[in-house]
UniProtKB/Swiss-Prot annotation:
The gene is murD. It comes from Desulfatibacillum aliphaticivorans. Coiled coil: none annotated. Belongs to the MurCDEF family. It comes from the Bacteria. SUPFAM superfamilies: MurCD N-terminal domain, MurD-like peptide ligases, catalytic domain, MurD-like peptide ligases, peptide-binding domain. This is UDP-N-acetylmuramoylalanine--D-glutamate ligase. NCBIfam families: murD (TIGR01087). Cell wall formation. Catalyzes the addition of glutamate to the nucleotide precursor UDP-N-acetylmuramoyl-L-alanine (UMA).
Length: 450
């Protein structure tokens, strides 16, 4: 793909848009970056791309800019159905995303990881498994390092491990990973998709360009993933819910075994794994299959499982105060993630939820909240919705903010109980992102008097 002299519009000026602009300019293209936001809200990125040599258009989109482009590259947060993009398509202008663009310049095999929950942990763990096996890996994508950064850079890895969101999959065309992994499909982003069918169809796109020489790693217990199997051409391996004739992982006490049909090939121990919860055993199994399919050794996979310490804001232990433990699960931005968090605790939980609703069905938490929660503290825009859904299951405290929620929870929690931030919502009503929310929670907890 030759970009030299082409007029390219990069839509969205955040991390991805800035990286796309740099990449395309490096390839000799003429680049315009378009964003509906103001220069004040975008901060230093505006001057950054201008200094690179790009034009910048802010505010309402200019139709002519889009319809006269040679190529449009959109960031994940930009809906691919907005009117200016539809008009450009009608004029024959290709509209793709950053992942599709980068993949056309990447020679190394790609391991693509998608799914509602667990994908960042799995992506990171695969990278560790590859490196522990002596195979150099670039780990990026939706995890915070756009793939175009790898495509632009001089240092090349033997394999690319990429976290891919549903929004990114909506704009792929020829993207064809050697290994595609789908962790699970549960309700999320219902504010953007027209029901679960549309969301699941987006996730299924990760497999669409694979061939029989490739590998699809699937969750056999997930009904949406199972429904995709008939349309997948790649070899299918299951990290959970494997049926007798299928290839994949079978869990037993403290270990996981890899089978193809009735034949056992290898076994991995989970005894030294520091990640807690059944969901993290599934994450380890999924990562192990993907890494093995890409050439990692069993020894390297085992070493990475033993050494991996987990990621921030994912049921991360923060501190113990007066025999009460505090956990930061800010990354839990949907209902299923909250369920997974609650499943991992035997002690009564003081649960902090809230933020910006993504269209989740909070009533699905009713039974688990009744079993596990001592109190529920609600914050942010979704406080009313969560209260309506769960007020009959647990005492609900209107906290408003995370700081107040921690204050109320500290007063109420008894020795041996736990306080868990697991919001079940996006963070954008009060914070820039889930990381900022998690850091704020940790700040408040660490400031508590002992």
């Amino acid at each position: 793909m030759d970009l030299k002299g082409k007029k390219i519009v990069a839509v969205g000026l955040a991390l991805t848009g800035e990286a796309v602009a740099a990449f395309c300019l490096d390839k000799g293209a003429s680049v315009t970056v378009a964003d509906i936001a103001s220069e004040t809200s975008l901060g230093a990125r505006v001057q950054n791309v201008r200094d690179m040599g790009a034009q910048v258009e802010l505010g309402p989109h200019n139709m002519e800019t889009f319809t006269q482009a040679d190529l449009i590259v959109i960031s994940p947060g930009v809906p691919h159905t907005i009117p200016v993009l539809e008009a450009a398509r009608e004029k024959g202008v290709p509209v793709i995303g950053e992942v599709e663009l980068a993949s056309r310049f990447i020679q190394a095999p790609i391991i693509a990881v998608t799914g509602t929950n667990g994908k960042t942990t799995v992506t990171s763990l695969i990278g560790e498994m590859m490196e522990a096996s002596g195979i150099s890996a670039f780990v990026g994508g939706n995890i915070g390092n756009p793939l175009v950064n790898y495509a632009k850079g001089e240092d090349k890895a033997q394999v690319v491990v990429a976290e891919i969101s549903s929004f990114q999959l909506d704009t792929i065309e020829s993207f064809a990973p050697k290994v595609a992994l789908l962790t699970n499909v549960t309700e999320d982003h219902m504010d953007r998709y027209d029901g679960m069918e549309g969301y699941a169809a987006s996730k299924a796109r990760v497999f669409m360009n694979q061939t029989g020489a490739d590998f699809a790693i699937l969750n056999g217990c997930d009904k949406w993933s199972r429904a995709m199997c008939g349309g997948i051409k790649a070899s299918q391996w299951f990290f959970t819910g494997r049926e007798e004739a299928e290839a994949g992982i079978a869990m037993n006490a403290g270990a996981m075994d890899f089978f193809t049909g009735a034949q056992k090939h290898w076994s991995l121990s989970l005894k030294k794994m520091t990640l807690s919860g059944e969901h993290n055993k599934e994450n380890a199994a999924a990562a192990a299959l993907a890494a093995y399919a890409a050439g990692a050794s069993v020894e390297g996979i085992q070493g990475a499982i033993d050494a991996f310490k987990g990621l921030p804001h994912r049921l991360e232990f923060v501190r113990e105060v007066m025999d009460v433990k505090y956990y930061d699960d800010s990354k839990a931005t949907n209902v299923d993630a909250v369920l997974r968090a609650l499943e991992g605790f035997n002690a009564p939980v003081h649960l902090i939820m809230g933020g910006r609703d993504k269209g989740g069905h909070f009533r699905d938490l009713k039974d688990m909240v009744e079993q596990k929660a001592a109190r529920l503290y609600v914050t942010g825009e979704a406080a009313g919705i969560i209260t309506s859904a769960l007020s009959g299951s647990v005492e609900v405290v209107q906290a408003g903010t995370i700081e107040k929620a921690v204050e109320f929870a500290k007063r109420a929690a008894r020795p041996g109980e736990v306080v868990v931030l697991s919001p079940g919502c996006a963070s954008f009503d009060q914070y820039k992102n889930y990381k900022e929310r998690g850091k704020d929670f940790c700040r408040v907890v660490n400031a508590l008097p002992a």
